């Protein structure tokens, strides 16, 4: 598996190519789960100050992946993690996940949590390989047979400013 040459940065979610990528993720989830089991963070919420929204772009600047960390004090939640289907298998998901973990650790987060779907086998495998363990629902989530809730501890790391490269 060749590792993609990427630039991962904090960006706003308003660029047309990023909006298109987010919509692809929503369409993918809609094919797998009913609306009540889809928990996408709305586009407007990605602009809030407690959200760190990252975009992975290739050497030509094409948006290939997104991910967000929503800060909640000592813990954070991963949201909107999506890799364009045509670019999967190149290590992009792991790179953006590592960047999200670094961003959360830099913000002082000690526990990182997420919710994903039971049919999202690639995501589940990645999260398990990177140390996430299954747990009960958290925050406002309710038990859902189509959802998997996970968490992993983090070490605090230096944070990066908006627009700076997180991975190259």
Regions found by a protein language model. Give the residues of each.
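Acetyl-CoA-dependent GNAT
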Residues: 3-79, 84-86, 97-98, 103, ...
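A generic structural signal for beta-strand entry/edge sites
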Residues: 73-75, 111, 147
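Active-site acidic-Proline motif in GNAT/NAT acetyltransferases
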Residues: 84-90, 118-119
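Conserved GNAT acetyl-CoA-binding A-motif
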Residues: 97, 104-115
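Cationic, low-complexity basic patches in intrinsically disordered or flexible, solvent-exposed regions
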Residues: 162
């Amino acid at each position: 598996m060749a590792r993609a040459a990427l630039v991962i940065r904090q960006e706003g979610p308003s660029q047309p190519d990023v909006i298109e990528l987010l919509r692809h993720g929503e369409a993918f989830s809609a094919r797998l789960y009913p609306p009540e089991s889809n928990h996408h963070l709305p586009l407007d919420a990605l602009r809030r100050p407690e959200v760190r929204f990252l975009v992975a772009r290739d050497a030509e600047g094409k948006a290939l992946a997104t991910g967000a960390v929503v800060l909640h004090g000592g813990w954070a939640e991963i949201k909107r993690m999506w890799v364009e289907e045509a670019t999967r298998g190149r290590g992009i998901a792991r790179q953006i996940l590592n960047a999200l973990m670094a961003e959360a650790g830099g913000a002082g987060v000690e526990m990182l949590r997420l919710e994903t779907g039971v049919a999202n086998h690639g995501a589940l495998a990645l999260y398990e390989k990177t140390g996430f363990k299954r747990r009960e629902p958290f925050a406002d989530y309710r038990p859902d047979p189509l959802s998997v809730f996970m968490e992993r501890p983090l070490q605090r790391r230096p944070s990066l400013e908006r627009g700076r490269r997180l991975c190259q």
